[in-house]
Regions:
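Conserved core segment of the aminotransferase class I/II
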Residues: 1-69, 79-81, 164
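Residue-level recognition of strand-loop junctions within catalytic nucleotide-signaling folds
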Residues: 20-21, 56, 102-104, 147-149
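PLP-dependent enzyme catalytic core of the Aspartate aminotransferase-like
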Residues: 109-111, 115, 119-128, 134-183
Length: 183
């Protein structure tokens, strides 16, 4: 297990493992893990302290993940707002902490999704991750987390919508100009 998902500490890269049963049966395995952690990994000391605090303190995760909890409300809001943007389709996740919207390639003819995401960041100050960053084969998806509070999500998705509107208009003009030139 780890802190990233259960305790909302993305980036901490701190986790733990429990081995149960007869220790003699797994002694070589444990020795191998210890050797690997000594050779290739470096202990995340602040993260180790965070584990102790997370496991021993108030377990707010139960309130957060309740059927009507904050994460469900934020997921529903992000899903609703993203679905309202023209040319964007999205599946509502049942267990993930993010959406993976698809952009209609006819409305958003993206050639380089890294540049597309960089432009969004530069123009609207919203950071997303391009779909190809998750081995998606086409430049028509991006990932957006719905962990921020509702007000922050509303503002971020409003900015995404503005960026996408400008992108659609810019590329619609190019298509219109090309059609006029052919006539």
């Amino acid at each position: 297990n780890g802190l990233s998902k259960n305790y909302r500490s993305c980036g901490y890269r701190s986790g733990w493992m429990v081995v149960s049963g007869d220790k003699a049966m797994v002694a070589d395995y444990i020795e191998g893990l210890n050797m690997l952690s000594s050779m290739r990994l470096c202990a995340n000391v602040p993260g180790q302290y965070a584990i102790q605090t997370a496991l021993g303190g108030y377990q707010s995760i139960n309130d957060l993940v309740a059927k009507d909890g904050r994460l469900a409300r934020q997921r529903d809001l992000a899903y609703k707002l993203m679905s309202e943007i023209p040319g964007v389709t999205v599946t509502k996740p049942k267990a993930a902490l993010y959406l993976f919207p698809k952009l209609d390639p006819d409305m958003y003819p993206i050639k380089d999704d890294q540049q597309f995401i960089a432009d969004l960041l530069k123009e609207e100050k919203v950071l997303l991750v391009q779909g190809t960053g998750f081995n998606w084969p086409h430049p028509d998806h991006f990932r957006i987390t719905f962990l921020p509070h509702e007000d922050t999500l509303r503002e971020a998705i409003k900015r995404i919508a503005h960026f996408l509107e400008r992108y659609r208009n810019k590329h619609a003009l190019k298509k219109g100009a090309a059609a006029t030139a052919k006539a």
